[in-house]
Swiss-Prot record:
HAMAP family: Ornith_aminotrans_3 (MF_01689). This is Ornithine aminotransferase. Belongs to the class-III pyridoxal-phosphate-dependent aminotransferase family. OAT subfamily. One of its GO terms (cellular component) is cytoplasm. PANTHER family: AMINOTRANSFERASE CLASS III, ORNITHINE AMINOTRANSFERASE, MITOCHONDRIAL. It comes from Bacillus subtilis (strain 168). Its cofactor is pyridoxal 5'-phosphate. The keyword Transmembrane does not apply.
Length: 401
């Protein structure tokens, strides 16, 4: 076997044994550091996806990796049958970051969404007084909250639902950004309005100005929980600690994941006050790995990196520069550039995938979303020099469309 065949061998092996539920670009990543990755042949590429914003702190950040190693040498898993010495510090760190009184830890973003809806439903029955089994959740058209049965039931994408029915009941969808539709959808049985402050998978869609403030006010007036899915937008990605900060709103509940584990270990959580998360009692919810000491130690280090290195400020500054450079590109295929911080979408007049493939050939890795949008979301630790390198590659590909 020659070195040149290694990537193809791995891709063939993956295709042969793996379920065909992904369509990745034809590249194998075998090593990474900071904003750069390598394939088995030693070719370097810039990562402009950050594992869908899970790698905000950069690949293999030394502080996070050290926390992983140190904790792995002590204990990795206890289950929640016993206390562990990392869970309390993780709770306190995350509670102070979010300004909430209680934290419930899980592993993946989709699990955290499930936990949020379970909490909202039980809150509706025990606190709001909704009749049993009548609680409703309102979500938005174009949302993405994961791939579990709840998440696909929340989705408006038929392809996500096809062949997986029946969907879960008690869900209503409104157009993203439509205040009147939200007002009309609320009934006495409404438990929560679940939203993304910026819709990522829909193509980096920013809500109309004033929508989130008005939605928050309506939910407060109607005694409906206002729940923000900040799994992808939170923790510095948009140039603020949370994307909700752009609109000056504080949700009743945050859903966090991805960068909470620094791109090193899966951990997610929901954060809310005692009135909401206090509805859980022993046995009502759980996870064997949720809140495990390894994940908690990694998460504490990941949050410290975000704070100590002021990555939200860095995202804001570099994001404004990056967006302005993208807007200056004279290309017949660019329809719109939108985004906040280092969370930017370039909408094209045609399919985006061929352009992602061309950018890969130029040494830059990104991914299409919603068919016609190229999503650019590099690690927040990226240097301006590296960003300038990427900008030149993007200009070259889009100008020569």
């Amino acid at each position: 076997m020659t070195a040149l065949s290694k990537s193809k061998e791995i891709i063939d092996q993956t295709s042969h044994y793996g379920a065909n539920n992904y369509h990745p670009l034809p590249i194998v990543i075998s090593e990474a550091l900071g904003a750069w990755v390598k394939d088995p042949e030693g070719n370097e590429y810039m990562d402009m996806l950050s594992a869908y914003s899970a790698v905000n702190q950069g690949h293999r950040h030394p502080k996070i990796i050290q926390a992983l190693k140190d904790q792995a040498d002590k204990i990795t898993l206890t289950s929640r049958a016993f206390h562990n010495d990392q869970l309390g510090p993780f709770y306190e760190k995350t509670a102070k970051l979010t300004g909430k009184e209680m934290i419930l830890p899980m592993n993946t973003g989709a699990e955290a969404v499930e936990s949020a809806v379970k909490a909202a439903r039980r809150w509706a029955y025990e606190v709001k007084g909704v009749a049993d089994n009548q609680a409703e959740i309102i979500a938005c058209v174009g949302n993405f909250h994961g791939r579990t049965m709840l998440a696909v039931s929340l989705s408006s994408e038929e392809e996500y639902k096809r062949g997986f029915g029946p969907m879960l009941p008690g869900i209503k969808l409104i157009p993203y950004g439509d205040v009147e539709a939200l007002r009309q959808a609320i009934t006495p049985n409404t438990a929560a309005f679940l939203f993304e402050p910026i819709q990522g998978e829909a193509g980096i869609v920013i809500p109309p100005e004033g929508f989130l403030q008005e939605a928050a006010a309506i939910c407060k007036e109607e005694n409906v929980l206002f729940i923000a899915d900040e799994i992808q937008t939170g923790l510095g990605r948009t140039g603020k600690t949370f994307a909700c900060d752009w609109d000056g709103i504080v949700p009743d509940m945050y859903i966090l994941g991805k960068a909470l584990g620094g791109g090193v270990f899966p951990i997610s959580c929901i954060a809310a006050d005692r009135e909401i998360l206090g509805v859980f009692n022993p046995g009502s919810h759980g996870s064997t790995f949720g809140g495990n000491p390894l994940a908690c130690a990694v998460s504490i280090a990941s949050l410290e990196v975000l704070e100590d290195e002021k990555l939200a400020d860095r995202s804001l500054e570099l994001g404004e520069y990056f967006k302005s450079e993208l807007e200056s590109i004279d290309s017949p295929v660019i329809k719109e550039v939108r985004g906040r911080g280092l969370f930017i979408g370039v909408e094209l007049t045609e399919a985006a995938r061929p352009y992602c493939e061309r950018l890969k050939e130029e040494g830059l890795l990104c991914k299409e979303t919603h068919d016609t949008v190229i999503r650019f979301a590099p690690p927040l630790i990226i240097s301006k020099e590296d960003l300038d390198w990427a900008i030149e590659k993007i200009k070259h590909v889009l100008r020569n469309a």
